[in-house]
Amino acid sequence: MSLSAAEVNKIAWLARLAIDDDKVEAYARDLSQILGFVEQLGSVDTSRVAPMAHPLDEAQRLRPDDVTETDQRALFQAHAPLVEAGLYLVPKVIE
């Protein structure tokens, strides 16, 4: 697939990117090569390849989902400058 300079400019505009006019042709050439490679990948016969979610057959060992810390909300709020109804009060930043 070959991209024109106009198509590169349109893609850049849609992506809100600024491209120098002297680099548009180089981008068109590079993007065309990338798209050609993607087309080449799409033409590979993968009918005999087994689908997989992960290339390794190992499973990740996860720790048990146990509560390891106690509720320290009262302690933390005791150190806060301003607390009301269990909420931290902070100065207004935006008017």
UniProtKB/Swiss-Prot annotation:
EC numbers on record: 6.3.5.-
InterPro entries tied to this protein: Asp/Glu-ADT_sf_sub_c, GatC
Official protein name in the record: Aspartyl/glutamyl-tRNA(Asn/Gln) amidotransferase subunit C
Taxonomy, superkingdom: Bacteria
GO MF annotation list: asparaginyl-tRNA synthase (glutamine-hydrolyzing) activity; ATP binding; glutaminyl-tRNA synthase (glutamine-hydrolyzing) activity
One GO BP annotation of this record: glutaminyl-tRNAGln biosynthesis via transamidation
Catalysis: reaction(s): L-glutamyl-tRNA(Gln) + L-glutamine + ATP + H2O = L-glutaminyl-tRNA(Gln) + L-glutamate + ADP + phosphate + H(+); L-aspartyl-tRNA(Asn) + L-glutamine + ATP + H2O = L-asparaginyl-tRNA(Asn) + L-glutamate + ADP + phosphate + 2 H(+)
Function in brief: Allows the formation of correctly charged Asn-tRNA(Asn) or Gln-tRNA(Gln) through the transamidation of misacylated Asp-tRNA(Asn) or Glu-tRNA(Gln) in organisms which lack either or both of asparaginyl-tRNA or glutaminyl-tRNA synthetases. The reaction takes place in the presence of glutamine and ATP through an activated phospho-Asp-tRNA(Asn) or phospho-Glu-tRNA(Gln).
Family, similarity comment: Belongs to the GatC family.
Main enzyme class: ligase
Binding partners and assembly: Heterotrimer of A, B and C subunits.
Keywords tagged on the record: ATP-binding, Ligase, Nucleotide-binding, Protein biosynthesis
